[in-house]
Amino acid sequence: LDVNKNFITTWRVNANDKIVLPFIVDQYFQGNYNCTIDWGDGSETEHVGGKNSIAKRPEHTYSQAGDYNISISGKCSYFVLSANAYSSTYPELLKKLIKIVSWGTVEAGGYGFGDAENLVEIAEPTKKTFIKCEDDSFAYLFAGCKNLEVIPSFLFRYVNENTTSFEGTFERCEKLTSVPEELFENAPNATNFEETFAYCKNLMTIPTNLFANNKQSNNFKKTFAGCTKLEKVSYELFDSTPNAINFDRAFY
């Protein structure tokens, strides 16, 4: 597996489980997939997409229980567990994703891992990769990943500089105890931090300079609401956010 080029995720399956990848397959997303999938169990690789829209989401059945690395190379623009059409159809699959091993370079445009409740590990990007969201938003990207314990310090190292929203990005990540100080430093135009860490009920500390480079931010509504184990908050936390006007229930 080429961890530099491939988008690699780990899934924990039982014998005869079927994994269906959360591709968006309707006509409005034609041309957004032209990739090869290695299912990680020694089976033949599968090519998906091209000029025409794919007819259905890629799927694969595993004969034996275990943890399998699914590797995607090529163009994979959308991988959205939280899309209603996927999450409502395959709710059991949200529990089977356990790691993001590598982001690769797959021309990603919009990804979402909301309610992947057993996701425990997120890779740190090594190149400009999935972080170039077309809608300039990371809203609810990892919301409900309740077993995620650590956020990589430079997860958003290569963020689109025009990114404006981190609304609910880590909402309900219940095992987080701390947040890296450098997390948002490369998003100088971010304005919306509503519910970013809301209901992270084991969060104990917030770095003083978390928003030091987010001078355009104006919305901190419920940013840390429900963070009942916070030990203290620095008086200087919002010193670099002169445009902030909404602190409604920021620490409620």
Predicted feature locations:
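Solvent-exposed loop and capping/linker segments of extracellular ligand-binding repeat ectodomains
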Residues: L1-Y252
